[in-house]
């Protein structure tokens, strides 16, 4: 973006707000004189990214193709603000649980980017077993886009559910399992959006 006179024509990625996006694509325009230089630089970058994530994302595929000329491009200042915000916003694990080793406590997901009625609509989702941490993460994400001049709306979300190894319902479940199967159950926790937080809030 800084080296070339690049213009964003189209971008689309992700679908559901509560799912990690699987694929995305973007169409960009550059002056014809820079076409080959851009191709070389991008291919080098794509190779570096694929090597960086070779272990954690062995099936990662990044492709560069020629496209037909764009009929319209995104306004330059808006494009720069958008790209800076996307680059700045946190995406992925933010904090691990202090109670259960290996359990993600707080995360943020850059779920989707869509073009609707001449606007770019970005959807993110924050999860945490601690409500205050989820709110803090949500505010951090909002700030990244507000600094880029975007309009930000926030949904109600759902309450967190901090694991309690000493809870009565867990002890009852453990004893029932042992009585039925004559063996100790394995107690585990997951990082996901569950109804349990709503139950805990009421009962």
Please report, for each region that a protein language model flagged, where it lies by residue.
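Midchain, well-structured core segments that form catalytic/ion-binding scaffolds
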Residues: 1-127
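General N-terminal targeting signals
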Residues: 23-25, 127, 139-141, 169, ...
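Generic non-transmembrane alpha-helical segments
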Residues: 1-4, 37, 41-52, 140-148, ...
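An extended, acidic, His-containing surface patch that forms the Zn2+-binding/catalytic region
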Residues: 63-109, 114-117, 131-136, 146, ...
């Amino acid at each position: 973006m800084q080296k070339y006179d690049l213009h964003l024509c189209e971008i689309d990625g992700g679908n559901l707000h509560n799912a990690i996006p699987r694929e995305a694509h973007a169409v960009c325009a550059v002056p014809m004189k820079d076409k080959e230089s851009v191709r070389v630089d991008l291919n080098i970058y794509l190779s570096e990214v694929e090597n960086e994530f070779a272990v954690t994302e062995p099936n990662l595929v990044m492709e560069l193709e020629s496209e037909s000329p764009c009929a319209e491009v995104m306004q330059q200042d808006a494009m720069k603000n958008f790209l800076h915000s996307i680059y700045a916003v946190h995406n992925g694990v933010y904090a691990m649980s202090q109670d259960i080793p290996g359990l993600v406590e707080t995360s943020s997901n850059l779920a989707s980017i869509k073009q609707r009625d001449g606007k770019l609509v970005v959807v993110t989702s924050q999860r945490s077993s601690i409500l205050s941490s989820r709110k803090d993460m949500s505010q951090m994400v909002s700030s990244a886009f507000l600094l880029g001049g975007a309009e930000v709306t926030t949904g109600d979300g759902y309450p967190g559910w901090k694991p309690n190894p000493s809870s009565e319902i867990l002890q009852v479940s453990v004893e029932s399992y042992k009585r039925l199967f004559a063996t100790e159950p394995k107690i585990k926790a997951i990082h996901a959006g569950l109804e349990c937080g709503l139950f805990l809030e009421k009962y």
